[in-house]
């Protein structure tokens, strides 16, 4: 069932991307099926809807979508889209946002600065076709803002944390493979996409694959050799000690430079402490080695965020602390109550949340059909 759902969603993501391309829009699939490629078995991830970033800005994209379906609702970062073959689609003109106006301004400038690379980063989605997905550096920042948004609004889901674990793993795989494209340094360094027929067996290590078969054409091989084991070629080509040492040195230098860039952006965006909280969870819950953490773990903040995950769940659906009911008024009161709880840890976002919500009300009136 899970396998079939992923195959179906893959097809839909490819078709929706191609449909927008024919209409003159470049696109990039956010999260979702792009994240599935990072899993040991891409068909094992529980699929959701399709989040597609469409180039063009809010006015142009909203106008285009409403020329097809006039009554679709728009919010600051996306507009609803008619379901495509039964699949829910959200069309983004902004990948994500932050509630603090100052930090959000910087985030939107960052997205504008790096968008060209995202729209041109093509990968194979299994054997079904090509889509554009974000680069690994972009994902480290974008998906952290997405998780933060869930924390500030209603609640973080476990799948978002699992996704981020594999985002970090994918980051190091990409830089490891780019440092030594001819030799993959560890058995776990190869991301592959098994055929749907093989994924149901549970054996996700059986297929023979070379390193990084799913990377973009520009960033590495997109096809695999059926005769390549992909992780242990020492017997075939002799002693690789010197080459391995050189590759490790190059990998460390490249990944360190990339981490420095990511850390700089996280500080600029006011996400440093939240990143530390997520790294604490990655280490304590998911067992990620300290050498793979992108910032130093923050135990105090990590325990707080982990408690929020366990108490609330995705969108706060399981939060027993919701004492105001499910009405619109109750929802707004619950948001204020949540802001009070969060202000001690994330004051800029929590204090700006009521202001942003008020501003967003008028923004939606402006774009209301």
Region spans (language model):
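Conserved NTP-donor binding/palm subdomain of two-metal-ion nucleotidyltransferases/polymerases, i.e.
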Residues: 1-48, 53-176, 253-369
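Intrinsic disorder/low-complexity segments
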Residues: 124, 173-256
């Amino acid at each position: 069932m899970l396998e079939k759902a992923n195959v179906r969603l893959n097809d839909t993501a490819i078709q929706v991307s191609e449909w927008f391309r024919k209409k003159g829009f470049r696109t990039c699939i956010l999260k979702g099926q792009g994240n599935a490629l990072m899993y040991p078995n891409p068909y094992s991830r529980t699929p959701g809807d399709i989040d597609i970033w469409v180039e063009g800005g809010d006015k142009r994209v909203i106008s285009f979508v409403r020329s097809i379906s006039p009554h679709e609702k728009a919010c600051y970062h996306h507009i609803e889209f008619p379901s495509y073959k039964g699949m829910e689609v959200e069309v983004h003109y902004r990948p994500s946002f932050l509630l603090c106006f100052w930090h959000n301004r910087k985030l939107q400038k960052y997205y504008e600065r790096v968008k060209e690379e995202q729209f041109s980063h093509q990968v194979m989605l299994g054997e079904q076709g090509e889509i554009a997905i974000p680069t690994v550096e972009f994902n480290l920042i974008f998906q952290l803002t997405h998780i933060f948004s869930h924390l500030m609004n209603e609640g973080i889901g476990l799948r978002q944390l699992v996704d981020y674990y594999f985002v970090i793993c994918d980051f190091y795989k990409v830089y490891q493979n780019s440092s030594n494209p001819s030799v993959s340094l560890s058995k776990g360094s190869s991301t592959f996409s098994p055929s749907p027929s093989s994924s149901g067996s549970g054996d996700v290590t059986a297929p023979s694959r070379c390193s990084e078969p799913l990377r973009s054409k520009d960033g590495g091989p997109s096809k695999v050799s059926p005769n390549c084991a992909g992780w242990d070629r020492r017997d075939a080509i002799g002693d690789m000690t010197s080459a391995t040492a050189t590759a490790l040195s190059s990998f460390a230098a490249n990944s360190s430079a990339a981490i420095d860039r990511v850390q700089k952006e996280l500080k600029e965006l006011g996400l440093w402490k939240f990143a530390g909280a997520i790294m604490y969870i990655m280490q304590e819950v998911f067992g990620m080695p300290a050498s793979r953490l992108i910032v130093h773990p923050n135990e105090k903040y990590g325990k707080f965020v982990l408690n929020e995950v366990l108490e609330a769940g995705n969108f706060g659906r399981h939060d027993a602390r919701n004492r105001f009911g499910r009405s619109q008024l109750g929802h707004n009161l619950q948001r204020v109550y949540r802001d009070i709880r969060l202000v001690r840890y994330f004051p800029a976002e929590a204090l700006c949340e009521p202001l942003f919500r008020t501003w967003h009300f008028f923004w939606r009136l402006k774009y209301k059909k």
